[in-house]
A protein has these predicted regions:
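A charge-rich, low-complexity, intrinsically flexible signal that marks solvent-exposed coils, linkers
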Residues: 1-84
Length: 84
């Protein structure tokens, strides 16, 4: 299976993962956004938008990561969580 196919399959598998801690969910979000949209754009949400700011930070951590590298990281993380 090529990388895009593996990424799409991992995206579907991620929907059925058992409950995960927020930090793991934020990692999944940040890697997914980097894989699909590239580097974060726009301004960081305001200080009272806690969820938006956390998501922005999770994505920002991946700045500079190539989209294919992010796709592979996402597949690897989903595989790790599914096997746990």
């Amino acid at each position: 299976m090529d990388l895009q196919g593996a990424f799409e399959a991992a995206t579907e598998r991620a929907k059925n993962l058992p409950n995960q801690p927020n930090d793991v969910l934020l990692d999944l979000y940040g890697i997914f956004k980097q894989a699909t949209a590239g580097d974060v754009t726009g301004e960081k949400p305001g200080m009272f938008d806690f969820v938006g700011a956390a998501k922005y930070d999770a994505w920002e951590k991946r700045r500079g990561m190539k989209q294919d590298d992010a796709k592979q990281a996402y597949v690897d993380l989903v595989d790790q969580l599914a096997d746990a």
